[in-house]
């Protein structure tokens, strides 16, 4: 696969994942403005950190992806769904880590774009 096709896959999956995260945000956070509240509540119940809770939830999605591979599933839509879930748990975990560390990731972005990614894509076009 050449770089152009690979970059298309990246954009495709990031778009799908972003749409799911935004749609499910309201479902999981409800009226609470804290998007990560479910992980924090589970942490309170289990005595684990919110990050460890997210990682434990992610394990279910890793198993699901392994199951697809073991069964030889070729349905692209099913792969998109399962890999998207896994990617989203990586993003949710990163959000928890950013919050725990008091990071300001908004300062690292420019108008919603990640400079490193934008630069890499621009360099690929040269």
Can you annotate each of these PLM segments?
Residues 1-126:
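Intrinsically disordered, low-complexity regulatory regions
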């Amino acid at each position: 696969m050449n770089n152009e096709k690979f970059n298309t896959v990246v954009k495709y999956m990031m778009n799908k994942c972003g749409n799911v995260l935004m749609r499910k945000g309201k479902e999981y956070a409800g009226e609470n403005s804290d998007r990560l509240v479910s992980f924090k509540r589970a942490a309170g119940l289990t005595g684990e950190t919110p990050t460890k809770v997210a990682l434990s939830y992610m394990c279910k999605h890793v198993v699901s992806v392994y199951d697809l591979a073991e069964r030889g599933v070729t349905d692209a839509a099913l792969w998109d769904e399962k890999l998207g879930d896994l990617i989203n748990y990586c993003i949710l975990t990163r959000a928890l880590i950013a919050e725990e560390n008091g990071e300001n990731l908004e300062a690292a972005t420019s108008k919603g774009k990640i400079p490193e990614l934008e630069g890499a894509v621009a360099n690929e076009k040269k």
